[in-house]
């Protein structure tokens, strides 16, 4: 098998390759971005942020961008009454604005209308053609204009009343088309593609691997990889044949190569991608076509396809006709963009569709970010309790006594001791909701400890005043906040950094390795804030009000500063999806 020869090369390449290259799908500019597009981007961004945090020696690279060719783009531009190029510029810029607002830390934003990409597509085409994998043939079949693909009879349903056929997958109508196209010998790569899908957890979650294998259980027909230029002119011309343009999906998939410098030799420093994040609607194109194209070109397929499901809105599919498409920038006005990031990664799971609702978002963000996290910081740094505004060092004597005498102190210690290992395991699988679960459990333990130890009874002037014990309680609480802030950096980077700024944690001490240093790991040390040295001043320039509670029917601009509410667990029933499929 061809793939076995490529696997031999992989050991030589990855053995010396410190690159961790991650991609989002490039987003089709036939419409403005919605939360489903943002979800793809925040998954990839959180994954890359974790990789940088956990493996600082690794060269992590994230690529995103926009897909700008094809019939649907021509139609959308015409509908808006603007030239196609200007339409593409405008929509592509909106994606940039959304990603910038959401703190997506991409290293490259590729557009398929760029010259570097056109050059890569031409080279890739010539490689496939020279190797004998592309041939010209008369082709006829059912063509879906909306999906820009030919479909077989088994992929269609017939409306008996009208005689119209529709795609089973998308529901869009198809039309019979006869034309001369270039064809790709997909049938020759069926065994190789199946072998790739079945080995080494290539496709995750596992349900999507099964979907691909079910598709591969039937013979694969060769596929059309060009269109007549008189029908699809907004596209890249086929090299040496101006009568044809490159099929939009072949064009679009090559972006992953264009972004790292293909066809120049430098691209091999980043190839293959460690992980490609995609939505379930484009699984076939990536899992079968893309894999086959790469094998045909003599290139290694990606390390893993990470496939996520879609978002409904109040239980209904998002659609323009229902007027329920959620604009990320508008949603951010209500929840802040950090809040929206948290909600998407907290509530979304890859193997099943997530449901977006204002009620749910408000409940989760108020309960977890405003109360459980934000309120604990406000209480520990309150001037009435902490007039010196310090992150103190604990007393070894009082630390030992608290751990011995208070069950809640021991539970907090146990929770923090497990935080690093558990969250690392969840991050490695992109199980961001479980990272949030684990971190919130630690913060609940910290809130319970703080409440049970009653630090307000120990402050100066109180009958039981004991400054050393008070500072030890504050130090233990701030250790829990600091560790939580480090863990949450990939999910809510701006909010986590504000938390760590308030605690005066130096940038150099925000790495994953600092999760190993706290009162929990060094209970006999008198120098605890996690090995950070002596007591330090809190940052007076950073507000202790970390996340404002969201009020019903108000925008973020209208929310006035409010007194933090006591932290409490949400009474909502946990979703059965918490046991995540691997």
Curated annotation (Swiss-Prot):
EC number, UniProt record = 6.1.1.10
Motif 'KMSKS' region location, chain numbering: 317-321
What does changing residue 224 to L do? Results in progressive degeneration of photoreceptors and glia that show accumulation of large lipid droplets
From the Swiss-Prot or TrEMBL record, state where the protein is found: Mitochondrion matrix
GO molecular function, a single term: ATP binding
**Xref: Gene3D superfamilies:** 2.170.220.10, HUPs, Isoleucyl-tRNA Synthetase, Domain 1
So where does ATP get bound? 320
Protein name in the entry: Methionine--tRNA ligase, mitochondrial
State the organism named in the record. Answer: Drosophila melanogaster
